[in-house]
Each structure stands twice: as structure tokens, then as C-alpha cells.
Amino acid sequence: MNIKYITSGLLAAMIVNCTAFLTSCADDLEVGKNIDESAYSGIYENNAYLRDGKSNLVSKVVELHGETYATTVKMGLSKTPNTATSAKVKIDAAYLETYNKAHNTDFELYPQDLVTFANEGVLTVNANAKSAEVDMTIRAGEGLQDDKTYAIPVAISDQSSDITIKDESAKHCIYLVKDMRNAGDTYKGEDAVKGYLFFEVNDVNPLNTLSFQLENGKLIWDVIVLFAANINYDSEAGRPRVQCNPNVQYLLDNNETFLQPLRRRGVKVLLGLLGNHDITGLAQLSDQGAKDFAREIAQYCKAYNLDGVNYDDEYSNYPDLNNPSLTTPSTAAAARLCYESKLAMPDKLVTVFAYGQMYGVATVDGVDASEWIDIVVPNYGSSAYPIGNMTKKQCAGIAGGGSSLTPSTARSLMNNGYGWYMGFAPSPDNYYSIFRRLDGAETLYGSPLKDPTVFYKKNDPTPYQYPDDL
């Protein structure tokens, strides 16, 4: 190897490269040219956002079971301030029009004189913190209507000069308030574990919810699902649609007889949705398809005065990917449907059965799953798990059909922070065994489950004596 020639070659190459580098720098650098700083905008800003302090949600549904409801409003910052900084929160009545327009809702403003903020709404974020909270109290009033949703838009105001508010969404959080004082037969305490029940309505009357009563008069099932309507393809319209079989449609058409008596006692009634052996499916809608289908679900809930929906991804065929309403089956598509459903009906429950592709994606468009999934229930013999910022309070810890609500199971639910237990397809013909499997109710609620005395036959609102009239 000739070291002399290699060294000479390297030196020549370095001279050429340095010349090229200096020429490039000279070409790029223009002294006195204004620099576009847009790429750096925001990096020094301290952006604020508003949340409900208890739930950390932007949109919080509040049910008034007593004369007052207490929570906190939290202002968070994107970074720790150099010195203490402050802002105020207040009711922004004008924002409600914007909110209603965005969600196609018609919520009325909650009476402002029934809402108070501690410390005149002032929040102070200390130099070693990134958030602050202020107490908020919502009082009940005599003029409130039952079964109506009111809105309280809360906004940041009078912020210090070092606080930036990026947009209207960051500036606001909203409380959707329902007066439940006259519909409290399911209310067993704010932190009580709740019951979630599927009714096979092809065979069983949902009024049988009323058979399950504690000795203290409370009903154990807080939410029931009409199982199930279907998602099907409408060939004339060229899009997915809701399809109700005659049994489901009968209950919807006669909801004042079979559903509203439950709702007036505090039971939430949901429409169950299930695939039905064609090209559509709950986890295979395109973004636009999900938005359109969610709007139809919202229309059903409004027309028949229902409390929300349960989605179950089963029994769908592979989609036609040439159809603009459909896409490849995925958990992302299922999450999009849940997200769009919550946008279309923010005061209703959006719940999922964690099966197939229905559950698993934690964010849609940067919005956490805790904002658009209210409850997740598991398959038989398993427990649901939270995703994103969800907690076990939004999850069922057991699923009927594979598990019983025994005293030890009830203690496990409470000790592990689960918010729900799930039951499936009760029939009066099986009440003896069903009630024996619910003896953990006393552990949960401090009151034993009464033996059944009444039941309801299909499509008949008459209470019959159990077991004599079976």
C-alpha cells in the first residue's frame, strides 16, 4: 500500500469538499433576509385546556340524584410556568349555540343561578405545577324538567399574559346535566358497582328488569340492552342502515308501554347493534360511513327516547371495498364509529362488547377513548380492561353466562375498582338459577336481592305472579 498517494488523495478530496461546502453555505445564506418563524410558533407558548376535575373529561354527563352535585373544574397547562400564573372560569352562555350547531343538538342552558364556583372561579397554577382546580357546585331547582338534558358551558377567562389558549375547544369544557331526582330506583350510590344486562328481546320482555329488586327497593340493573337490532346494507340507498327485526321494532313502536316505565325508574335503555351476514359491519365502516351511521343511531335514540347504544362486532361478511361507505375491518374503524356516535349524541351512552374488532384503539383524531366510550363489557368468563385514559370504573369485571356474582366476586369487583358487572339473556323460566347466581348483591349494596314475585310475558305489560303464572 502506498501511504504517500493515499494521503495526497485524501487531502485533495478534503479541499474539494470544503470548497463545495463553503459554496453551498454562501448560496443558502442571505444576509438581512427575513426568517420564516412559523415553524417555531408555539414552542414557547404555555397552552391551557379545560377539563372536569373528577373525570378529566371535556364533556361530562352529570346526573342529579340529590339537591347538589359537587365537582371541580381543572385548567391544565402544556408546561410548568416559571412563576405562578392564573385564570378564571365562568359560564359562557354564548358558546352553547356553537356547541349545539357542531353536534346537531338542542340543549338548553342550565339555570346559571344554580351553578357556583369557589373563589369567584379563580385558578392559580403554582410554579412547580401544571394544573389547578376550583370547586364547582351544581344545585337542583324546582323548574327543572325530568328526562331533559341541560348544558353548562364553562370557559377560561381573564388568563395571565403567559397563558395561551389555542382554540375554542381548549378554552371550554361542558357539563350535560339531567335531573334524576324522580327516577332514582337504580341509584345505589355514586361509587357503587352497577349492573349491565342484555335482553334477548326475540324471546323476553325487557319489563322483566323489574323482577330484580333489592330488599331496600332498589333495582340492580342500571343499564339494559335491547339485543339486538342490526347493521345491514341498503341496496337502494347504497349505504349501511339500521335494521330492526319485528321483535325489536315492536318494542320501539310501543316504547311508552315497554321501555319508558323502566326509564322513569332510572334504568338506562340502550339499542343493541349487531352484524347480520352481509357486507356491512360495525368495524368496517369508512370515516364517512361511520359518521352517517352514527347520525342514524342518534336519530333512533331521539325518536324512541333511548339512552344510547351497544356495539357488538359479530356476524358480518367481508366488505365490498369499492363501496365508499366501507373499509377493511379494523379496530380503528370500530373506534371511529364510537367516536362519531359520541359526537352525534354527547349526552347518550356509547358502549361496546369487547369482541371481534370492536375495541382496542385508544385515540381518534387525538381524542382519548375515555371521551367516546362510556362502558366496555367483556366476553363470558373474562374481565374488560381500560384503554387510553379510561379506568376500570368504565369496565365490567365479570360477564354473566361464564361468571356468577358471588359474595367473593362482588368483593373482588370493589377491591379492584371495577364499575360494572354484566348479565345476559335472563328468562323467567330460569329465574331460580339466575337469582341464586346473584347472591353477591348484598355484598355490593348492603341489601339482599329479593326472591322474584312478578314477571312479564313477551309483548304483554301485565305483571304476572311468579312462579304461579309461569
Question: Which stretches of residues belong to each language-model region?
Answer:
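Bacterial N-terminal signal peptides that target proteins for export
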Residues: 1-11
